[in-house]
Amino acid sequence: FQAEDGIRDRSPSRGLGDVYKRQMPDRLTLIALKGIPLVKPGDDLIQLVANAITESGEQLMNGDILVVAQKIISKSENCLVNVTDIEPSDRARVLALEVDKDPRVVEMILSESRSIIRKKPGVLIVENKLGLIMANAGIDHSNVESEIPEQTLLLLPDDPDASAERLRSDIRSQFSVDVGIIINDSVGRPWRIGTMGLAIGISGLPAVTDLRGDRDLFGRELRVSEEAVGDELAAAASLLQGQGAEGKPIILVRGYQSSAPSQPATAALRAPNEDMFR
């Protein structure tokens, strides 16, 4: 992977010939690392990764990618809130009646959000503080170890891109290899049933590959194509991670290559002036 040098200009005014040629692999290998315990606040993720690599009989190589479930990042960074510590505002109380939710949970959703996009009983679709459109701001209480799980809320990391960069840097120091890191989370989609993995934090690989200026099979120039590489890899890894009690939060991806510079996951966010649905 090339060293990071910022986010490329994705505006149409950029020269269409200024593209990064892809080396499309014939094969991708995805391996669920074994032996990762339930993560607690303050746990050393590097040691957990080292133990899992050994137990899985693998060895990290330059160019590998680790896709890490958001939950273990959030737990290690202590992004936990007990609902008994939350005092709901008047706005949260009114909204809670509309959506049939605990007003304390609604207060937490509001505090983690920029705006409400849609609402109905049981769910609030919001733009959260990271700019992601998610149900309930990505707040969850599944797979949270607690005496009363329903009272413990797990928030998204404050800055998933920074979390990914720290983990990548620590792995480079520990293993002397340069890997890519994707932090993924499961999200729903407005016009499709079912959840899938989404990259909410990235370091060491592009979030989006700009294909404008490339040619199709018949030599026609691509004018608008941009590939969400981070999300595609996040979704593939999510198949192995599962959604419930599988206990496979870290997936090793081997075989993806790119000459494009690293981008944070925020590079994949659509600009407000390009949003046709809000």
What are these model-derived regions, one by one?
Residues 1-3, 64:
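Helix-centric, low-specificity signal for extended rod-like, repetitive segments
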Residues 2, 11, 162, 166:
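Short, conserved clusters of charged catalytic residues that mark active-site
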